[in-house]
Every structure is written in C-alpha cells, then in structure tokens.
Amino acid sequence: MEEVRVRFPPSPTGYLHIGGVRTALFNWLFAKQHGGKLILRIEDTDEERSTQASIDGIIEGMQWLGITWDEGPYFQTEFADDHVAAAHRLLESGQAYKCFCTKEALEQKREAAMAEKKSEVGYDGTCRHLTPEQVQDKEAQGIPAVIRFKVPQRQGTLFYDDEVLGRIERAYSDVEDFVIVRSNGKPLYLLCNVVDDIRDRITHIIRGQDHMTNTTRQVLLYEALGAKLPVFAHMPLTLDLKKRKISKRSHGEVVAVQFYRDHGFIPWALCNFLCLLGWNPGTDQEIFSREELIQAFSLSRMSRVNSVFNFKPGDEKFFTDPKLIAINEHYLRSMDLAELGVLVRKELEEEDLWDAAYAADKEPWYLHTLGLIRDRFHTLKDFATAGRAYFADQYAIDPKP
C-alpha cells in the first residue's frame, strides 16, 4: 500500500496565521491517522518579502502547538534548478511556448474585451502559434518573454475528484494559456508547487478552497509532466461575521498564532478549536485529546461551506472567538495540576512572582492553590494578573470608596 505523504507549504512573508495552522493541523491529523508523513516545505521564492524572522516564527509556532513534521523543513529556493528544468521540458515537448506580449498590450486587449462585453477576457493566444523563426527573430531583438503553458485545445471538460467537494469540472475552453515562468527566468508558484510535490512524492493535497483555480491548472501540469495526480481535498475557508476572509489587514494580531501564545492560551486548546472550524465529528463532542482527534478525524466529515470565526473588534470581554476562550477554560480546569503548574510557572516568572520554593517544599501549597483558583480564570495570564494576590509578597488592596 502506498505511503500517505502530505505537506504544509507556508510562505515566509509574515507571521504564522491561524488559517495556516488549521491547514497544517488537518494535514498532520491525516498523516497520523494513516501512518504517513507530513513534510514541511517553506515556499520562499518571493525573495523580496521572505524573511528569516518569518521562517523562525513558522517553525517556533508549529513546535509550540505540537504539530510535528517528519521531513524538512525544505526550502523551495533550494530546488530552483528542478523548476527551470521542468519548464524547459515543457518547452521542448511543445507543451509550453514563449510569449512576447507586453503588459501594456495585454492590458489594452483586456480593456477592449471588457468594453465589448466579451465573455472571455483572458489571454487570446497571440504567441501560441509563432514559428521557430519568429521566436528567434524576437529573441534577437532582445524582446523579453514569459513562458506560457499551452492548454490542450480539447472538447469537453477537465476534472478531478475532490475528497471534500466531489467531482470538480471545468471546460478546457475556459482555461487560458497561463504563465509558468516570468520574463526574468524565474518559474511561478503554479509550476514550482507541482514540481516539488512530484519530487516529494505527495499523495494527498489538503488545502483551502481559495486554491481551486490553481488546482485546475496544476492538474494539467501533472499530466504534461507525466506524473500521477495526487488526491485533492479543498477545505472551506474561515470568514468573519461579515463574511470576509480573516486576515491581519482586516482583523489585526488576533489571527496570528503569536497572539494566543502571548495571551496565555494552552497550545492544544487552540488546535482543538481550529479543528472545529470546517470539520465536525458527527456528534456533539467538541473537546478532543490528541489521540481522540487523530482517531476521529476524517475528510468525509469536512464541511463544504465556509466556517465563521466569531470575532468582534473592540469587545474587551471576548477578545477572540468566545468558543476558543471556553475551550481554553476547559483545559485550564481539567488538566493535570502538575502540568498546569509548569505552564503557570512561566507566567509567574515573567511577572517576577515565581518563588523557587514553589518547586520544592512549597510545591504542595502551590499546586493546591492552583486547583482552588483555576476555575475563575480564562487564560494562563490570569494567574499572574487576576491571581497576583496569591503569589506576590506584597499586594496592595484598593480601599472601597
């Protein structure tokens, strides 16, 4: 039986996003359930925006959450030669061609097509039928060129079977010849992604529905490169109450993993919450241990409709989704006291409230106190703020007016 191999390919151009973590989590669960492997691949081809700080944030965030990978991290830029070689193979086999159309010319054609209310405003194939002599002439003139994939001019539809959405079809005539290599010679994401997945022997691609336009094109690339098509599963997106995709631009730090780390959330509580955004076990159960979730997870239970992140900016009580706060409270109140003691210690140390005796002769008192007060708190931070009186040597009480 073929080994299950999935991947999480974040782009290191910013913080680790909870949407990205949800993707990593679902891939991790699927790999664990099937005895497979999760590959971490950093897609760092955007050299201007990629940063080492973002790479560190991705790795540290996943480690904090306990989402472990079996191979990697690999870096996409390390395999640039593979991507270029694949593009040349497609050129040589006649499945791709050089396009010398300028951006200005393409924009003029697009605007004209829109003005005439044409149904198709994509690339019109101007350079598709250039003769070798015409190509050589343009190259001799120093005219820059991109490389476009030559979409087969077939009747009917291209399709793939999606594990979440079922059979996905699109007419060949609706897919324009798309760019796979920029005029500077650098291959685009569409091609790089496929080449890397083929090399890494990826069997299942579990990702958001916002990638579906890419998938249609990538199906053609798999075929052209003579590779077996992986199984696709497109997850629903996570939107806010106004049906907007959650993002830092619209929602601020609340969508960053670091926000929850800084605010004293228990790592698995965040994972537990995220798995419920777009997936359900078919029962009323909402609290899962790692082992329970690995056993219960199934792509067949993935929702086809978008999930909602219930966040209201400016709400001081519910500074994130209330369900996430409730799940975190559950873990605070039910986890082993010794384990809780380790987590709270970090918070007390940050506030200079930690006493070394709490790990020695005062440990029974320390753990007993945590057991008495934990039902009042929402996050680990609360032990060092609202619970400060229990651990401070001196604590001033404001007199009532």
Residue ranges: model-predicted function:
Residues 50, 75-79, 95-98, 150, ...:
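Catalytic cores of large soluble enzymes that bind and process phosphate-bearing ligands
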Residues 1-116, 213-227, 269:
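N-terminal Rossmann-like or analogous alpha/beta NTP/dinucleotide-binding catalytic cores
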Residues 84, 93-95, 128, 152, ...:
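Residue patterns forming the tRNA-binding/recognition surfaces of aminoacyl-tRNA synthetases
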Residues 13, 20-21, 47, 79, ...:
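Short capping/connector residues at structural and topological boundaries
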Residues 226-397:
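Catalytic adenosine-cofactor/nucleotide-binding cores of aminoacyl-tRNA synthetases and other
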Residues 8-12, 42-44, 195, 199, ...:
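Short, histidine-centered active-site or binding-site loop motifs used for metal coordination
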Residues 98, 102-234, 239-249, 256-257:
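Active-site cores that bind ATP or allylic diphosphates and position pyrophosphate for catalysis
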Residues 55, 80, 84, 103-106, ...:
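Alpha-helix initiation and N-capping motif
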